[in-house]
């Protein structure tokens, strides 16, 4: 009975390895699939955006 269990486990591992190699389920997503416009200036643009005062109609009271 122990040999049968080991045989079944080895078969399951081999089949899962075959599926991983043949399938494309683990391919990384394309980096340019969704363009990100939330930070077009890069790190320096993000820093300048933090340093820049926020647009506020009542600037002295914006805090």
Curated annotation (Swiss-Prot):
Signal peptide: 1-23
Cysteine amide PTM sites in chain numbering: 62
GO CC, one annotated term: extracellular region
Phosphoprotein in keyword set: no
Keywords of the record: Amidation, Cleavage on pair of basic residues, D-amino acid, Ion channel impairing toxin, Neurotoxin, Secreted, Signal, Toxin
Record's compositionally biased regions (Basic and acidic residues): 28-39
Modified residues (D-leucine): 58
Localization per Swiss-Prot or TrEMBL: Secreted
Recorded family membership: Belongs to the O2 superfamily. Contryphan family.
Function: Its target is unknown, but this toxin may modulate voltage-activated calcium channels (Cav) or calcium-dependent potassium channels (KCa).
Name of the featured protein: Leu-contryphan-Tx
Species, as recorded: Conus textile (Cloth-of-gold cone)
């Amino acid at each position: 009975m122990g040999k049968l269990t080991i045989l079944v486990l080895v078969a399951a591992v081999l089949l899962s390895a075959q599926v991983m190699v043949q399938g494309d389920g683990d391919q990384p997503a394309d980096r340019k699939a969704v363009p990100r416009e939330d930070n077009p200036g890069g790190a320096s643009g993000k820093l300048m955006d933090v340093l820049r005062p926020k647009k506020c109609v009542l600037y002295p009271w914006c805090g």
